[in-house]
Amino acid sequence: SSAASDVYKRQMLGILQDREHSLKIRVGLILGMAHDLQGRFNREQLFSCEEVIERYQTKSARKFVRKLWKEEKPSVQERWEMAHKMFRELYELELLREDWDMLLMESEELLYSHGADAYKGISSDFKRWAKEESNIQIQAEQLLVYFIFTYFCGAVYDGRIYAKVQMAVISTFHIYELWKARWIKNEGELTPEEIVELVYRYSREIEHSDKNLERMEKMMLRDRLPWYRG
């Protein structure tokens, strides 16, 4: 129902906006919550969804996500392969503007073409820069909030709760990678205008096309994120 959808959405947004915890933990919590809600939905146990929502608000849920991430931490090689694969999925979408394809190819080259160790180095350097110089973590959080808000509306009607939340997480990941690529291109600089420009270009390609939104959702159903990997 629409009321249930609003409750789930509100609770997820509450978790995402709680800055006492790292964004990584918050993402793990909303993926975990969506994963368990999906299970209840599939088994037609919607009456127990309240309990799922409450469980993911607790300290033990945060502890659980932290522990899972420690145990399931992908290797440098796996992380590079996973990131590259997720980025390449953007080529499966309908191309609306030529300059978008150019941006994707250039970004892919900058990020992934030098192998796993180079990608790890780039990611660590960017993270360090972002911490010191920029409010990119807050921008990423706001993007997630926006995407959950936008994508989640129909989730309870079509039963694709996990796919919709995964889509919000992957969309934010894609934009984060585009920021990272531009930062490399600029030799360690990224202006607020460029941050906004890349969000705009992504939205223009993906969100302004129903066909692309539908394709992306199908990809989410095909390539499910093991939620604890974040």
Locate predicted features:
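Short, small-residue-biased leader/transition segments that mark boundaries at the very start
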Residues: 3-8
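Hydrophobic, aromatic-lined core segments that form the binding pocket/scaffold
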Residues: 17-230
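Glycine/tryptophan-enriched, flexible segments
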Residues: 11-12
